[in-house]
């Protein structure tokens, strides 16, 4: 299987399967001299860790990360720091139940990657989906923790803004609330509505979709590139690569189609510091594929989890029509744990964009009035 690596200068290769002994990633391109410990990565893995709530998978994984390479500590380094060599991170799987999948070893689960993998490779890991499992995203979150250290002036944070048909009230948006409920919701009032919906879904043995919104602040104007390496194209590709992601929009996204030119254009005035100030952010912080200095805003739509308890019609490898009921432990709403994954992928894209921009121009950005 190819294409397990993403990024250009900041490159991440993930490895491992849902029911294998371990999974992890190799991060290449991290500059030397950056303080890095397992504890700094673990903070973010704990946000994604399964078994933390009633409406996520009950698979109990500690997701304890080990740094196998790429760091060094001696009397001169003032703590453990990156060396500039590949950073290898490993997370052991400790709570697999492969027997839950023995009855579907030859069946293609509707809505899952089973059939597509089999059609391409002629072989597949049916135990939890192998590489197609959301378990793979633990490695992405670990890589994202490293990426954040390369861009310390940038803040990346995400929130759940919709579960099923129920959207937040944006007038209630409060980032502090995302740490006060298990759904990372910025709107406290929507939480009981979501819980009622999720309880109905859980009792029915079904699943539901969700939308995650991510915001990156502190990104200066100038990161990215025109045409074929647009920052929004790189970000959209990274977010679409997340398991169960089915749609991405930047800024106003599809809603911009209903606007007029005068409504959609982000007008500018001069600020007291001599730099332009935008009066709106319909573009989501990216213009012409290059960051504008505005907050970068994107949303990701996650489909309902394909593995559900309700019997469905499908076929098996022998070409027989069968009825399938999936066993195992699965997320009624995979979008809940998608929040830290969306943050991680955004951080990786921005770290890569920063390194590429610095390599091309030698500086972070060109303030208005500055000479090249």
From Swiss-Prot:
GO terms for cellular component: cytosol. CDD domains: Chorismate_synthase. GO terms for biological process: amino acid biosynthetic process; aromatic amino acid family biosynthetic process; chorismate biosynthetic process. Gene3D superfamilies: Chorismate synthase AroC. It comes from the Bacteria. NADP(+) binds at residue 48. HAMAP family: Chorismate_synth. It comes from Caulobacter vibrioides (strain NA1000 / CB15N). One of its GO terms (molecular function) is FMN binding. PROSITE patterns: CHORISMATE_SYNTHASE_1, CHORISMATE_SYNTHASE_2, CHORISMATE_SYNTHASE_3. The keyword Heme does not apply. It catalyses: 5-O-(1-carboxyvinyl)-3-phosphoshikimate = chorismate + phosphate. Its cofactor is FMNH2. This is Chorismate synthase. InterPro entries: Chorismate_synth, Chorismate_synth_AroC_sf, Chorismate_synthase_CS. The keyword Amino-acid biosynthesis applies. This reaction introduces a second double bond into the aromatic ring system. Pathway: Metabolic intermediate biosynthesis; chorismate biosynthesis; chorismate from D-erythrose 4-phosphate and phosphoenolpyruvate: step 7/7. Belongs to the chorismate synthase family. NCBIfam families: aroC (TIGR00033), PRK05382.1 (NF003793). Disulfide bonds: none annotated. It is an enzyme of class 4 (lyase). Homotetramer.
């Amino acid at each position: 299987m190819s294409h397990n690596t993403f990024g250009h200068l900041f490159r991440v290769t993930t490895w491992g399967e849902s029911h294998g002994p371990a999974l992890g990633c190799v991060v290449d391109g991290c500059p030397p001299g950056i303080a890095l410990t397992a504890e700094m990565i673990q903070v973010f893995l704990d946000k994604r860790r399964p078994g933390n709530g009633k409406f996520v998978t009950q698979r109990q994984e500690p997701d304890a990360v080990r740094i196998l390479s790429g760091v060094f500590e001696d009397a001169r380094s003032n703590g453990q720091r990156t060396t500039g060599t590949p950073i290898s991170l490993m997370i052991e799987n400790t709570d697999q139940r492969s027997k839950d999948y023995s009855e579907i070893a030859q069946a293609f689960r509707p809505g899952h990657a089973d059939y597509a993998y089999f059609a391409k490779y002629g072989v597949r890991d049916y135990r939890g989906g192998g590489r197609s499992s959301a378990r793979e995203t633990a490695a992405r979150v670990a890589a994202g923790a490293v990426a954040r250290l390369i861009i310390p002036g940038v803040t990346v944070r995400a929130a759940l803004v919709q579960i099923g048909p129920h959207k937040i009230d944006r007038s209630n948006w409060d980032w502090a609330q995302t740490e006060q409920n298990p759904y990372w919701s910025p709107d406290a009032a929507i939480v009981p509505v979501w819980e009622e919906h999720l309880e109905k879904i859980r009792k029915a043995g079904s699943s539901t979709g969700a939308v995650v919104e991510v915001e990156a602040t502190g990104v200066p104007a100038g990161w990215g590139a025109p045409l074929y390496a647009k920052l929004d194209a790189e970000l959209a590709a990274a977010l679409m690569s997340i398991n169960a992601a089915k749609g991405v929009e930047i800024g106003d996204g599809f809603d911009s189609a209903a606007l007029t030119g005068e409504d959609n254009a982000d007008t500018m005035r001069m600020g007291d510091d001599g730099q332009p100030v935008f009066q709106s952010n319909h573009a989501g912080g990216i213009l012409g594929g290059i960051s504008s200095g505005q907050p970068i805003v994107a949303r990701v739509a996650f489909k309902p989890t394909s593995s559900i308890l309700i019997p469905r019609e499908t076929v098996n490898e022998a070409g027989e029509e069968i009825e399938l009921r999936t066993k195992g432990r699965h997320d009624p709403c995979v979008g809940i744990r998608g929040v830290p994954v969306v943050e991680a992928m955004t951080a990786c894209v921005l770290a890569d964009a920063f390194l590429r921009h610095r390599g091309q121009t030698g500086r972070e950005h060109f303030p208005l009035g500055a000479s090249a």
